[in-house]
Amino acid sequence: MIPRIMSTQHPDNYSIPFFASSPILEGEDEITEAFYAFSVLGADEQMWDFEGKEVDEFVVKKLLERYPTFFKNNILGKDIRLTPRVPNPSVEKEEAKLLLETLQGIARSADYARIFYGDNIAPIFEVILPMTTSVEEIERVYWLYKKAVVWISREKIYDITVREWIGDFFPEKINVIPLFETKSALIKAAKITEAYILNRKNDIEYQRVFFARSDPAMNYGLITAVTYVKRALYEVLKVEEELSIPIYPIIGVGGPPLRGGMRPDNVDAVVKEYPSVQTFTIQSSFKYDYPTKDVVKAVEKIKSTKRKLPIPVEIPPFLVNYEAEYQKQIRILAPYINSVAKRIPRRRKRKLHIGLFGYSRNVNGITLPRAITFTAALYSIGIPPELLALNSLTDSQLETISEYYINVYEDLEFAMRFFSPKVAEKVGLKELAERVKEFKPEQIPEYIEEAEIVFKGEGDVMKLAQLRGFLG
C-alpha cells in the first residue's frame, strides 16, 4: 500500500506541540512526534529529514523499543513507512558524507527490525533525494547504497569477509525518490523519471516522484509554481502509460496558498486541485495549529479519497511577464523580508550553513530566508506573497489560469484578507494595491492594523500567525 499521508518536519507551526520539551523541536521530541503522527493522527508515512537538520539516526531502534505494542500491530516498513530525506552531494557539498552515513543507517535499522519482528523486514527502503536535476543524481544514490553498503559485505578484511565478521546488509537495494524543486527540474521531471525507470525496469514494481510546491512558488510566484507542478504531474502520467510501471506522485504542501493550501479545513480543495497525487504531506502547522479531532478527521478524509486523472496543462506564454513582475517586486521587498525574518521564531533545530539566515535561499542573486520564514515575513507586514505580480495579470488571463488552477480565485481571496494597501503603497507597490482593490476583498481589520505596526518595526508577529492560522 502506497502511503496517502506523509507527516513531515517542516517548521510552519505557531503552536508548541503538547509533548515538546522546548519551542524548538529536536531529538527526542521528534521521536515522539513520529509516533504521534502514526498512532494518533493516522499518517501512514513519516519523513525523517537529514537535509540540513539534526535528527536522530537511531529513530527506528527508539521507536521499536519505546512503543513495542503499536509497532507489533503496525509493521514499520510494511503497514507504515519511515522515509529519510538525504542531502544531495551535487548541491550540498558540506553535507555530502552524511548521505553515506544515512545509507549505512538503513542496514543498521534493518538489523533492529529483524530482532524486533523475528523476520527480515526493512523498516526503511526508500530515500528522498532533494534538488534532483538529472537521472545521474538518482542513479548515484542507488548505486552508492549497493556498492558502499551491500556489496562491501563481500570484501575480505585481513583474514575474514565483512559478511562473516559483521553480518549481511539488508535490504539488498533501495528505492530513490527524486524531489523536483526548480522550474527547470519540473520541466525535465518526466524525462528524468522515464530514464530512471528504463534503467531500473527489471528491478522496480513502481516509482515514486516528489514535487515541491514551496520553493517554486517562492522563486517564481504562486501561479508559475502551480502551473509547472501540474504540468509535471500530467507529463509523468504519460510516462506511466508508456512504460506500464505505476508512478505515484508526492506533493509537498503547507498551510498558506503559496505553499499549497494544505490546512485541515481545506483538504477537499487541495485533493481536488491535485487529483493524481498519491501522497500529500501534512506539515507542522497542519498537525499542531488546529484541534486534534479536526486534524484526524481531515487525515481520514484524504485517506478515503481515490486518485483521479491529472488536469491537462499547457504553459501560458503570459507567465513570462508574470515572473518578471514577481522578481521585480521581490527585489523591492527583500530588505523588508530580511528585516522581519529575524523576528520569526525558530521551530526546528537546523544545522548552520554559511549565509545570512543559516540555511537560506538565493533567488536571482538576492539572499532570502527559506520558504516558511519568507512567507511568514511577508504575511507579517500585510503583503501575502500569493498576491505578488497579480497586477501583471488581466481578468482574461486569470480566467485562462482558472481552467487548470481550480482554486485560484479562492486562494487569492484567502490571501487578500490579510493584505494592507497602505503598506503596499509605502514600499512602492501601488499598482499591486490598486489591482487587489478591484477584487473588493473581505479583509480582517484587526490583522491589517497589527501588520502595519509590524511593518514599522514593532507589533506582534505571533499574534498575526494565530489570526491567520499558520506561521509561514
UniProtKB/Swiss-Prot annotation:
Catalytic activity: oxaloacetate + phosphate = phosphoenolpyruvate + hydrogencarbonate
Cofactors demanded by this protein: Mg(2+)
Keyword Lyase: yes
Gene Ontology biological-process annotations: carbon fixation; oxaloacetate metabolic process; tricarboxylic acid cycle
InterPro entries: PEP_COase_arc-type, Pyrv/PenolPyrv_kinase-like_dom
EC number: 4.1.1.31
Signal peptide: none
Record key words, sorted: Carbon dioxide fixation, Lyase, Magnesium
One of the Pfam families matching this protein, by short name: PEPcase_2
Superkingdom of origin: Archaea
Molecular functions per Gene Ontology: magnesium ion binding; phosphoenolpyruvate carboxylase activity
Segments forming a coiled coil: none
Job of this protein: Catalyzes the irreversible beta-carboxylation of phosphoenolpyruvate (PEP) to form oxaloacetate (OAA), a four-carbon dicarboxylic acid source for the tricarboxylic acid cycle.
Family to which this protein belongs: Belongs to the PEPCase type 2 family.
Complex and partners: Homotetramer.
Designated name of the protein: Phosphoenolpyruvate carboxylase
The organism of origin for this protein: Pyrococcus furiosus (strain ATCC 43587 / DSM 3638 / JCM 8422 / Vc1)
Lineage, uppermost ranks: Archaea, Methanobacteriati, Methanobacteriota, Thermococci, Thermococcales
